[in-house]
């Protein structure tokens, strides 16, 4: 198993040990057997300028660390190579915001590190920076979390409830009374009249997916008409929905992809031409898609080479990303301005 990476690397967020402005074509940053213990279930969680790797409950971190978002307990501004994080317990879910990270264990306990300037970690307001993972005092047990730029949404074990914290000035905390003027430092419960199966967070918006397949969006409407998107996504054949900074995309049972929202960098252009897709990953303003032949495609914002095509022009039509000959891509992960793929040999 190999981990490939490309795109922005000014903080070392690709984890290859050699920080540079950008990497325009995929390169190998880890193998298994090796120090990262990669397997087909390993997950890469890219944040704003940092990256987490979760594999069998163990957590590794690389990149931007000025707010302690790598969870290493150090004053190191950036971490150029993946380093194992000393976490309180094995994590089963991890989400990365712009400059913070939250992990959840098998018992539904949440832990956070990084910036808490807006309450996004759910910790007391006196804690602005947290350099090691600290337990969050949650009112309920939680099963997953989605982190935006400055807010966090937790799916609770009680399936009709979420817990929210952070900045809610755009309405992204799903408050039924509308946007909040003050930051929410202590996680609060928001209850709905039906069961929630997934939570997603964009820059300043939140998307909830319910068990009846319907979707509900909250927050900044500048680049999206929420009612139109909710209608398009609330159908039975949607098998995966992902959100970017200011757009959303959905994968359907027939292998086709739809997208809506901001498109000035090509975020949603041309995705209708993708066929036989089995997985999508949506970054802040670019996207990745994997097809049934294990080929990888990219599109959208490409200022840092994050589309992996050998240049930095924005990509308005999905293009095939080429790894070394003979490689089969089995998963893909898009971040802010960086991208990752898990691959193995086709033989």
Where are these predicted regions, by residue range?
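Eukaryote-biased RCC1-like beta-propeller repeat architecture
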Residues: 1-347
